[in-house]
Curated annotation (Swiss-Prot):
Gene3D superfamilies referenced in this protein's UniProt entry, alphabetically: Aldolase class I
Assembly information from the UniProt record: Tetramer of two alpha and two beta chains.
Catalytic activity: (1S,2R)-1-C-(indol-3-yl)glycerol 3-phosphate + L-serine = D-glyceraldehyde 3-phosphate + L-tryptophan + H2O
Stated role: The alpha subunit is responsible for the aldol cleavage of indoleglycerol phosphate to indole and glyceraldehyde 3-phosphate.
Homology family: Belongs to the TrpA family.
The encoding gene: trpA
GO function terms (MF aspect): tryptophan synthase activity
Official protein name in the record: Tryptophan synthase alpha chain
Superkingdom in the source lineage: Bacteria
UniProt cross-references to InterPro entries, sorted A to Z: Aldolase_TIM, RibuloseP-bd_barrel, Trp_synthase_alpha_AS, Trp_synthase_suA
A Pfam family annotated for this UniProt entry: Trp_syntA
Length: 259
């Protein structure tokens, strides 16, 4: 059974459009999680393809300073895995959502209960950046009968043989990491990045989205040439926190990208 997230993104591809995923931090709002529905509606109205939602964690190894600070603000609003799932169960959206979480919060929740409870939400994908491929079976068997896709991250330093291993069981999409390091570190792309992404795109059977450091319309154009779309996090998280209204025009243009 092909997962809903894969089908949704493949439909966007067939329409000749670039896939655009904004990242937001759950609970990073003056109303805490009570503001989540408002933020999702704002993004949905701008035409985004799906939305990645971060669950805050006290030791976020993959997060740059902007997202780390957003996580701290969210924790200050007492956001937890339980409270996020409860909020998502009340949410009305047509968009598939993806949760990006470290392993510890969902382990504390109970993996089986977490997967079961997400079945009553619009969440269709999971990204767990600190779960090694070799340990994927901690959660993968629980997803077999669910509509949740476990999304792999493929870095620049991943060799071809390892890439093939990572993507052969992948569902939803492939998260191609554009930089070595943490999120939000823009302007320091490797010279062979486009070639790396193009090769990954050639061997993947599901959409490949480029993230980490993507922050300009030039980036959006560049990475839509060599992958199926982009994920933008730090730029959006910062703008939402600062109430920078200009972010709407950026999101709308990036989300409307035509191949």
């Amino acid at each position: 059974m092909t997962k809903t997230l894969t089908q949704h993104l493949e439909t966007i591809k067939r329409e000749g459009k670039g896939i655009f995923l904004p990242y937001i931090m759950a609970g990073d709002h003056e109303k805490g999680l009570a503001g989540l529905a408002e933020t999702i509606a704002f993004l949905e109205n701008l035409g985004v393809s799906a939305i990645e939602i971060g669950l805050p964690f006290s030791d976020p190894v993959a997060d740059g300073p902007v997202i780390e600070e957003a996580g701290l603000r969210s924790l200050g609003h007492h956001t937890s895995a339980k409270s996020l799932v409860a909020s998502l169960q009340k949410l009305d959206t047509q968009l598939p959502l993806i949760i990006m979480t470290y392993f510890n919060p969902i382990f504390q929740y109970g993996l089986k209960d977490f997967v079961k409870d997400l079945a009553t939400t619009p969440v269709k994908g999971l990204i767990i950046p600190d779960l090694p491929y070799e340990h994927r079976n901690f959660i993968l068997p629980l997803l077999e009968d669910s509509d949740l896709a476990l999304i792999p991250l493929v870095s620049l330093t991943t060799g071809l043989e390892r890439q093939q291993e990572l993507i052969k069981e992948a569902e939803g999409f492939i998260y191609a990491v554009a930089i070595n390091g943490v999120t939000g570190k823009s302007g320091s792309y490797r010279n062979d990045l486009d070639q790396h992404l193009s090769k990954l795109h050639d061997i993947a059977e599901i959409p490949v989205l480029t993230g980490f450091g993507v922050s300009t319309l030039e980036d959006v154009d560049r990475f839509n040439q060599v992958s199926d779309g982009v994920i933008v996090g730090s730029k959006i998280v910062k703008a939402l926190h600062e109430k920078d209204d200009s972010i709407a025009a950026f999101i709308q243009e990036a989300a409307a990208y035509k191949k």
